[in-house]
Amino acid sequence: MKLDELLVVAAAQWPHKRALIFPESELTFSNLHANAKRKARSLIGAGVQAGDHVGILSLNLPEYVESIFATNMAGATAVPLNARYRGAELKRVIADSDIRLLFTTSQFDGRVDFSAHLTDCYPELSTALNPSQLRIGEAPLLKSVVMFETTQKLGFISST
């Protein structure tokens, strides 16, 4: 059974039971399934196809888990990225992983600002006129960077 199929079964058997518990939020299996399905449809709408690689660069958040399930539902491969990567490490793993779309967060824990790290790695993000069709020489397959939250940052798409 694939990962996304496990969520479908869990949502059917225990729709109102807690699937995720975070300090500031909880999600039931039904909520997790609905959120993951919505993200999966968005991935497909963004052109992600079966076999594509979707990166996830984030703190431990409900959206992180939703993105893993959504990526599997869309038939793509989730590529969780180490939140401690910076500069050359981050650039290398994004390019070497053939990531087409990258989920990230603007949430800042006092140590990590992912949008700043990504903009440092890829200055093209700060001038991108069409953030759904990025053209980054050092990451030629990367077409979109999607923030979990609403954002006004150039080069980033809001998932909300």
What are these regions (language model features)?
Residues 13, 66, 137-140:
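A generic fold-level signal
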Residues 8, 16-61, 65-69, 86-91, ...:
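Conserved AMP-binding/adenylate-forming core of the ANL superfamily
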Residues 11-16, 145:
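A short, compositionally biased
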Residues 46, 76-159:
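Structural core segment of the AMP-binding/adenylate-forming
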Residues 1-2:
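Absolute protein N-terminus
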